[in-house]
């Protein structure tokens, strides 16, 4: 399949090396900034600037990241790369924390009313507006794929497992709900995320912890398998250790979006424009999304399922209610991701179109979300992976070349 070949080319060793190398360089230059995250957050102060509150900003950014990647993406990583993929998701998150810190520091330094996120630091910091335009183009395409179609496609598939419904009718409803929400701008998006995300995250966390507690005796073997398969220490795992790395990094990035450049666009809406504050909160988001939530998902699956199914794992706790519960969680996480990614796509489209035709983009974006209810999930996932990778290249290049500006 042509899409699969393109995907394998984009996500080859070159991009994985670039992600890890850039994250490692920033980690070294900033003296392991990841471990100072709590102190940076607690010493941040309220700003008098207009914009989203810090809590709304974090909910919007975290909601954008916490979509299907935390549930279906983690299950997919385990199915394709084995337990070893979990280790490489941790590695991607550790270096990803450094990446998002650098992204947000640079964005806060260079952003203005017209330029936001990577478009700002690639244009004003690096002096390369062409690279900023390329990034914006890939971001628009990623928003239409990963940001909308993938999320709704996965939710629609899960919904069909527990209810008989008309996909075309669902598409119409999705179009209306998404369109009406995103038309309200960052304030309405932030309010929706602030209302939905905390309760959904708390419920999902409690259920996963309960599943893990029920099967607690399996944890030592699970952790042993994670490290053994990550490095191919067992003969049976030797053939998949390299693939576990690739899948783990890819699914980790799909979940936390570190290195893609979406985080600084979202944080540019915050009232507090302190580079250090936005960098610290963005690190927390990657930690919570991947180190915490994806690990809980992986542990629950490895403890309670033989076929890498989140619903099957949760059934040991919720019984027949497991499928409706996971479907509801997917629905909330997916919706938060869709409305958050609209903001990224809209700002990128505005950069390309010089602020024109935003209404047209809004309608097209809502339509792409609606199409997710009827399109084949495999092709949508492949396209999303491709645009994720293409979006990362210009952003990572900018981070490497501006790394000394992060230190100042």
Regions picked out by a protein language model, each given a short descriptive name:
Residues 1-68, 78-84, 96, 213, ...:
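N-terminal alpha-helical transmembrane segments of multi-pass membrane transport
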Residues 14, 30-34, 69-74, 83, ...:
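Transmembrane helix-loop junctions in multi-pass membrane proteins
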Residues 18-39, 153-159, 165-214, 219, ...:
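Membrane-interface loop-to-helix entry segments
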Residues 22-27, 92-112, 119, 123-153, ...:
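Helix-loop-helix module between adjacent transmembrane segments
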Residues 32-53, 76-78, 82-86, 98-126, ...:
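Flexible loop linkers connecting adjacent transmembrane helices
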Residues 49-80, 113-119, 140, 240-287:
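Alpha-helical membrane segments and immediately flanking helix-loop junctions
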Residues 49-54, 82-89, 120-124, 129-135, ...:
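Membrane-interface alpha-helices at helix entry/exit sites of multi-pass transporters
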Residues 57-115, 124-125, 279-303:
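Membrane-interface helix-loop-helix modules in multi-pass membrane proteins
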């Amino acid at each position: 399949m042509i899409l699969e070949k393109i995907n394998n080319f984009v996500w080859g060793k070159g991009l994985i090396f670039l992600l890890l190398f850039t994250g490692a360089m920033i980690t070294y230059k900033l003296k392991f900034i990841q471990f100072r995250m709590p102190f940076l957050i607690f010493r941040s102060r309220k700003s008098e600037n207009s914009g989203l509150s810090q809590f709304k900003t974090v909910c919007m950014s975290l909601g954008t990241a916490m979509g299907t990647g935390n549930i279906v993406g983690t299950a997919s990583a385990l199915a394709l790369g084995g337990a070893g993929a979990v280790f490489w998701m941790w590695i991607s998150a550790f270096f990803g924390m450094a990446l998002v810190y650098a992204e947000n520091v640079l964005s806060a330094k260079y952003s203005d009313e017209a330029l936001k996120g990577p478009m700002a630091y690639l244009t004003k910091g690096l002096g390369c507006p062409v690279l900023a335009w390329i990034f914006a183009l890939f971001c628009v395409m990623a928003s239409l794929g990963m940001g909308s179609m993938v999320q709704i496609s996965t939710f629609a598939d899960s919904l069909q497992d527990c209810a008989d419904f008309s996909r075309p009718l669902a598409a119409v409803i999705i179009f209306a709900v998404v369109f009406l929400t995103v038309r309200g701008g960052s304030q309405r998006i932030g309010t929706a995320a602030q209302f939905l995300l905390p309760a959904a995250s708390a419920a999902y966390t409690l259920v996963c912890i309960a599943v893990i507690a029920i099967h607690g005796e399996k944890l030592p073997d699970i952790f042993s398998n994670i490290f053994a398969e990550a490095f191919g220490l067992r003969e049976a795992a030797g053939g998949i250790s390299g693939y576990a790395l690739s899948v783990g990094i890819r699914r980790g990035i799909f979940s936390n979006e570190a290195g893609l450049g979406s985080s600084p666009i979202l944080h540019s809406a915050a009232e507090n424009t302190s580079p250090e504050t936005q960098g610290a909160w963005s690190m927390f988001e990657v930690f919570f999304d991947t180190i915490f939530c994806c690990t809980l998902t992986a542990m629950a699956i490895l403890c309670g399922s033989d076929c890498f199914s989140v619903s099957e794992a949760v059934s040991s706790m919720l019984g027949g209610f497991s499928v409706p519960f996971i479907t509801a969680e997917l629905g909330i996480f997916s919706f938060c991701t869709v409305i958050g990614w609209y903001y990224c796509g809209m700002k990128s489209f505005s950069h390309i179109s010089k602020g024109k035709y935003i209404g047209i983009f809004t309608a097209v974006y809502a339509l792409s979300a609606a199409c997710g209810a009827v399109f084949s999930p495999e092709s949508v996932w492949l396209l999303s992976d491709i645009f994720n990778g293409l979006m990362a290249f210009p952003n990572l290049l900018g981070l490497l070349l501006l790394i000394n500006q992060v230190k100042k």
